[in-house]
Amino acid sequence: MTYTKYLLFSILVVCPSVLSAQGITRRIHQIDEVTVWGKRPMKEIGVQKTKFDSLALKENIALSMADILTFNSSVFVKSYGRATLSTVAFRGTSPSHTQVTWNGMRINNPMLGMTDFSTIPSYFIDNASLLHGTSSVNETGGGLGGLVKLGTTPTVAEGFNAQYVQGIGSFRTFDEFARFTYGSERWHISTRAVYSSSPNDYKYTNHDKKINIYDEDKNIIGQYHPKERNRSGAFKDLHLLQEVYYNTRKGDKLGLNAWYINSNRELPMLTTDYGDATDFENRQREQTFRSVLSWDHIKSNWKLGVKGGYIHTWMAYDYKREVAPDNWASMTRSRSKVNTFYGQAEGEYSPTKRWFFTANVSAHQHLVRSEDKNIILQDGGKAIVGYDKGRVELSGSVSAKWQPIDRLGMSVVLREEMYGSEWAPLIPAFFIDGIISPKGNVMLKASVSRNYRFPTLNDLYFLPGGNPNLRNEHGFSYDAGVSFEVGKENVYKLSGGVNWFDSYIDDWIIWLPTTKGFFSPRNVKKVHAYGIEVKANLAVQPAKDWLIDLNGSYSWTPSINEGEKMSPADQSVGKQLPYVPEHSASLTGRLSWRSWAFLYKWAFYSERFTMSSNDYTLTGHLPEYFM
């Protein structure tokens, strides 16, 4: 009876939101006329960019950004399911080669160099785009694969507005969404909240185990796959986002963004674990606070912006075992604290409609302490597990963009980076694009850049396994592509593109097992990552209020170790790097009528290897799969 009331209450709450959204949905479904790319923003000259529209971001507010990227882009999203670690990699690189920014501030974990996209609800993101390969140099350094750019917008409806949505899913999964906004001529204020929880307890057939069937003489006469329960996958995630924007109406804009995360997640046991799940506790907790304070001064042909930010992250991992009834022994009590201070200043100037100049400088100061409270931290003055380090990271760039004619554009970017006390060599990038046929908006793009990436703090200092002698990753990347867009207003729209990329990276960092029983990072002398990216979109409006929308993408991403053998027994040279799929694809189909929609999603990743030798062994090979 309680669940029935709960469901009815949810339907009553959701229905007004759905009904009020019908007009908005109809406007979204309208197919606009095709624009002429000669009027493209000069900031995007030569840039390989994938932008997600509001329909993709808000089609299901219960999704995380990991889900959005999986089914709407060509990047590789490695995920273990909802409320579990989800990372993103471009073009045959690793997740630590992907830079992520939120409202301009880089949010990669300085310990790991990567970002967990399962902790980013799409409900909190208003703008999202991907900058592929060399295009990331326009925004930041270190993105050997690319950049995921996330942000929020200050636009809210006038007056006071409130929204509440509740979702109910399988295995007693509940999602709560709330937003309160106030808008006036000068003030835009928004408060958003998301709370998701589930015991995530369900039955399944474990195909990774076999149970023997014996006769009376203890002879094996058969086998079967047991039915088990996922008893250690519960999660509770709370997100709060506060935004305040003020427009002086005299060219100045002030903004404050503050985002709080409180996550409590159990980590499921391996499907090959024959232990009793009730005898173990495997739990990860996280509390993160991110804030950005911004000021922008905007005039007709120039802009000046200043930002300051702060990130605090506390993470805990606990592994306990019940050694006797009601007697639990703590095996691991890992604790990490990260404090990051951020500052940035940028300027834009356009003296004429043919020229556009930018300058940018940013700083991140990281303070990290990592330890296991179950282990003595010092042995004769030397740490056994964990570390306590700080590092400052500086990045600056200048760019000049020139459009001699409407159909041709060129851009030069110069970037400089410093990590700790070490400066990177100058990072140059050149971009060019041109419209070769106004009919069909056929555009060619090409770019070349140098890129440079410093090791993460874990790469250098993590114990056991860190390698303080690691060299920095560096190399050159080349891009070329063609895109088109044709259509007829309110009838159909077809767009697509093909991009080729080629990267030669020296001293590539990869974590590999050692004979000492733990993993350790090392440099691979040379890696050649190359391939193609294909994307296409078709929207057809067969009748009034109807829309058929198809989005597809495909990536071919060989990432080959072309270095020298580390030993006579080394079989990794000439092989695909571990954990990197060579092929990936996604497809999303939508059939819409007014505010109703039927969706189909499909994603595919080819086989991956967990060993650098690419051996087809039980533990060294992951078969291809699709969702």
Residue spans of the language-model regions?
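Short, acidic, small-residue-rich periplasmic hinge/interaction motif at the N-terminus
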Residues: 22-58, 95
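N-terminal periplasmic accessory domains that precede
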Residues: 65-68, 86-89, 101, 115-121, ...
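Extracytoplasmic beta-strand/coil segments of soluble accessory domains associated
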Residues: 66-106
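Short acidic/polar hinge/loop motifs at secondary-structure boundaries
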Residues: 105-133, 464
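Periplasmic-side early beta-strands and strand-to-turn transitions of outer-membrane beta-barrels
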Residues: 159, 167, 182-283
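Face-selective signature of the C-terminal outer-membrane beta-barrel domain
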Residues: 244-263, 282-423, 429-431, 435, ...
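Membrane-embedded beta-barrel scaffold of Gram-negative outer-membrane proteins
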Residues: 301-319, 437, 443-445, 472-530, ...
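Gram-negative outer-membrane beta-barrel transporters
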Residues: 403-407, 500-504, 523-613
